[in-house]
Amino acid sequence: MGNKNAIYILRFLIYFFIFYYILKMLEGNIMDLLTITLSKLLNLKFYKNEIIVGKNIIEISSPCTCSLEMALFLGYIFGTPDVPIKYKISYSVFGLSIITISNILRIILIINYSNMINYNVVHDVISFIIFPIALFLNWFWIYLLKMKKIIMFK
């Protein structure tokens, strides 16, 4: 592994842990915002971080915030060497918006289809969607940087 690759991995890890720590501190607030947003969108009642769906209760818990996926995404973006900060910030706002909207849609699908089939099956199958979205955003980041000739690969 070249020195440049080692530096990139180190930068990625540092940024990942910084963003993960920040997001973990905000996780309770993010859960509250998700609960309120989802209950308003679906016209459902809620209590704390629980949404009442008929006779069932769906809890919006820590993994529902996508903190890990967001931190991985941000670590990747901010760890990218030789890219001006303005591009990193702009793309981070774009990417976090996509992840958040996808997450809200994911939870809506879980809520809507959890009554039809086994809840755990629905949850596990639909929850898989966020990770490929984050991977696509990382690929698209490099694609944009190459297209704009901000970074060059050999």
Curated annotation (Swiss-Prot):
GO BP: proteolysis
Tell me which InterPro entries the record gives: Archaeo_ArtD (IPR026432), Exo/Archaeosortase_dom (IPR026392)
Please report the record's description of how this protein sits within the membrane: Multi-pass membrane protein
Mind telling me which residue stretches traverse the membrane in this protein? 6-26, 57-77, 91-111, 125-145
State which Enzyme Commission number(s) the record gives. Answer: 3.4.22.-
Keywords carried by this UniProt record: Cell membrane, Hydrolase, Membrane, Protease, Transmembrane, Transmembrane helix
Localized where?
Cell membrane
Superkingdom, according to UniProt? Answer: Archaea
Cellular component GO terms, alphabetically? Answer: plasma membrane
Q: Where is the active site?
A: 64, 106
Molecular-function GO term, any one: peptidase activity
Assigned protein family = Belongs to the exosortase/archaeosortase family. Archaeosortase D subfamily.
Q: What does this protein do?
A: Transpeptidase that recognizes and modifies its substrate by proteolytic cleavage of a sorting signal. Following cleavage, a covalent intermediate is formed via a thioester bond between the archaeosortase and its substrate, which is then transferred and covalently attached to the cell membrane.
Name recorded for this polypeptide:
Probable archaeosortase D
Q: Could you tell me which species this protein originates from? A: Methanocaldococcus jannaschii (strain ATCC 43067 / DSM 2661 / JAL-1 / JCM 10045 / NBRC 100440) (Methanococcus jannaschii)
The beginning of the lineage is: Archaea, Methanobacteriati, Methanobacteriota, Methanomada group, Methanococci
Question: Which gene is annotated as encoding this protein in its UniProt record?
Answer: artD
